Amino acid sequence: STDQEIGRLLKQLDAMEVFDDTLIMFLSDNGASAEMMIRGKGHDPSQPPGSEMTHLCLGPGWSSCSNSPFRRHKIWVHEGGVGTPLVASWPNGIAARGEVRHDMGHCIDFLPTFCDVAGIPKADIPLTEGAPPLPGESLVPSFAEDGTVKRDHVYFHHEGNRALRVGD
């Protein structure tokens, strides 16, 4: 399971004595699914959840509950469909413990964040000739203080649904 494999990874980092200097960022999939369907041979409740013999569907009611307080579900571009929690751990790099940040991040921010941690300026990241500038912003400032990662906009598009988020 995911918990066991993450545990193995953390144990190995600790054994290598690099855990405290390692930035770990973990995020979930976006939004709960409102699907109500049967796939393949259907759903066998006697089998372990997540196995090939199961297909658990929440349906719109429980999906709304799972995404609460946000609206809608996976596929939709409302916050319930696109919002994803991120947990960051870096014992020697993040002084805050157990605090919540409300900055809007995006997966395109991961590379600039890791380069920032490694001391590589964004301008020094090699790009293919003619490539557009590297998107994303470092999330490192948010590790110290909420409200420090600013962006003009983020655009979402998925299965015919689209949105432009400006500010908060």
Where would I find each of the regions flagged by the language model?
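Outer-membrane beta-barrel transmembrane strands
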Residues: S1-R8
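A generic structural signal for well-ordered alpha-helical segments enriched in polar/charged residues
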Residues: R8-K11, D116
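Histidine-centered active-site microenvironments of extracellular/periplasmic hydrolases
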Residues: K11-W90
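C-terminal cap/loop subdomain of S1 sulfatases and analogous C-terminal strand-loop tails that border
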Residues: E52-E79, G93-D103, C107-D168
